[in-house]
Amino acid sequence: MKFGMYYNKETIGDVLLVIYKSDVIPAYVKQRNDIVALFDKDNEIVGYNFLNISNSMKIKAHGQIPICSHQVIDILNCMLKNASFPLLDYLDESGFKVGQIVEMEEHPDSDHLHILKVDIKKDRLLNIVCGSFNAKVGLKAVVATENCFMPSGKQIIPEEVMGVFSEGMLCSGRELNIDGYENKKGLYILDDSYNVGDDFYTLY
């Protein structure tokens, strides 16, 4: 199951957050040792809070951790196993793909939305509704794919946008929390050194 992982000691303390469902308010929690497990009303895991995590590992992140080593997951799973909580899958892929716009048409019911066909080297093109002013055919950008987690904690869920199905999101530098892009609008444009279909965070 996909999850988001976050750590920022300055803002939330020495706590590693793991989020499975960003749109679900936990119904109850269970704490065992330094792990707080959050559950929904159906008794399914919503996420984990690993307290005092620096006692177990050193983390340099200041926000989202899009991918991490098997060693990190193995340490966390050892802690979860000792607390009798469900284990984590390896976080080998971030869900942020290098994509290229191959088709573009204007949304019939909007003066700024575009309907895009985006290639991420999947078995088919993705249909994505996008409002960025600099979107154009041929442009390479970062695609947040289905169920991946943004730096903000938001999970990307396929949905209809003004009547048109959208199954992902093309990202701005600000949405990706890239330094220097805090106040810049428009898609974060990738050059030809990026290959379509690659994981953005194995390259960035």
Q: What would you call each of these model-derived segments?
A:
Residues 1-204:
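Phosphate-backbone binding interfaces of nucleic-acid-interacting proteins
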